[in-house]
Amino acid sequence: TSYTIYVPQLELNGTTITMNPKAVGEPVKLPITKRDGAEYVDVENATPLIGVTYTKDGDHVQLTAAPETMQVLQNKPVQGPLSWAFDPWPNQDAPYAKKLNVSGDNIISPSWFKLHSLGLESSPNINVDYVKAYKANGYHVWPLITNRFDPDFTSGILADEAVWKKYAQNLIQYAYIYGFDGYNFDFENVDYSDRDKLTRFVAYLADELHKYNIQSSVDVTGYSNSPNWSLVYDRKSFANSVDYVVLMAYDETWAKSTTAGPVASYPWVRDHAEKMLQEV
């Protein structure tokens, strides 16, 4: 079941966040948790953005109207070396119980968001229990956001800077309500003529998220002569905006290739990684 509310627009003054009830916010799915077959709203992270706060007294919980201000979260930045897992089919019932990396931090990126012409579209599978399970296992949770890999759609939203603010507000609200530490931008197949707009869009989102102590990353392909799939990325500028630039070290040989070959051979991955390190 999906329950959606409209969170007031967030405004920042120093380290204090003010909820402006006069400014209509963006729709946000409430964090639902299941216990013994029943559904409940998980308010642990959601307050005061959903309008309530709570106090515990033994076995009793008291709900009260939430204050209209709160402090910026103090999320800890990730520490390298990083191990990063991408989860295209997030399953709340079977989170990976082990750490991928014991000498640095671990990030999990569930595929939960898509850009929509009117704002952010969340997956019906978004789940607060998934977030809590991974965070309990020492992971940072950075959901993945796609542009649908549609160049025409992407051109439209890149030309409409008014919708950028909606995306930023929604991402911040979701991060505070669900407990996300950051986000991963997976914007692919973008028309080369929109290269500068894409660069500004990523920089805008990263800057707005940073104000609320939320980290960000952007995925880029390896190097090729493809305008929409490789040349469109201004990797150096991305590195000045986001916290991490993620190299998608594939496909050396595409699925539709007329000749057989490896997907990601070691020399190919090494060459692309070394070239990108010279830029970022």
What are these regions (language model features)?
Residues 108, 185, 245:
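Conserved, mostly hydrophobic/aromatic
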Residues 68-170:
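Glycan-recognition patch characteristic of GH18 chitinases/ENGases
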Residues 118-121, 125, 195-280:
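Substrate-binding surface in catalytic domains of secreted glycosidases
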Residues 106, 181, 243:
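Receiver (REC) domain switch/active-site residues of two-component response regulators
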Residues 147-178, 228, 246-257:
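Active-site-adjacent "subsite" loops/lids of carbohydrate-active enzymes
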Residues 1-104, 178:
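Primary recognition of N-terminal secretory signal peptides and signal-anchoring hydrophobic helices
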Residues 87, 112, 143-147, 187-189, ...:
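A cross-domain feature marking catalytic cores of carbohydrate-active enzymes
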Residues 97-102, 172, 232-241:
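Mature extracellular/periplasmic domains of secretome proteins
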